[in-house]
């Protein structure tokens, strides 16, 4: 498990954005995750190593859990054909949901807020509310249910 308590909120945001860039490249080019990270390391300040470690961790979690995450998105995107959701929105949802569900060091509400903020920066004007709706539905259905069961 990755420990990210040493990262500042700004570094965590950068890690999420870097992870988004990597999975975007993988989605469009089918390139290798390791090669994509190596290329990014060559072009970024090496002092960001912890940022890259967390980015790599998020990408790996996304890759390992993509089928489960996509099913969650499909079930909660009423009246939307999954394939018609913009690529960027799908990728932001995948990353944010993976972090919310599988990264215990991040409170679920932070994952939701980060997904919404990243959508405002990288996607369409309607994306942030769409992403917020899906994330909130998953949180209410699954995460809160886990907390009550515990």
What do the predicted segments below correspond to?
Residues 1-128, 132-150:
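N-terminal interaction/assembly modules
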């Amino acid at each position: 498990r990755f420990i990210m308590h040493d990262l500042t909120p700004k570094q965590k945001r950068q890690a999420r954005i870097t992870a988004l860039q990597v999975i975007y490249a993988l989605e469009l080019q089918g390139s290798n995750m390791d090669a994509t990270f190596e290329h990014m390391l060559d072009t970024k300040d090496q002092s960001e190593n912890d940022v890259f470690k967390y980015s790599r961790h998020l990408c790996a979690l996304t890759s390992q859990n993509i089928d489960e995450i996509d099913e969650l998105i499909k079930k909660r995107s009423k009246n939307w054909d999954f394939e018609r959701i913009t690529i960027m929105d799908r990728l932001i949802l995948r990353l944010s949901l993976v972090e919310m569900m599988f990264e215990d060091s991040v409170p679920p509400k932070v994952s939701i807020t980060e997904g919404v903020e990243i959508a405002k920066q990288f996607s369409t004007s309607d994306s942030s509310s769409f992403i917020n709706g899906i994330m909130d539905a998953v949180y209410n259905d699954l995460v809160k249910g886990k907390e009550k069961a515990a």
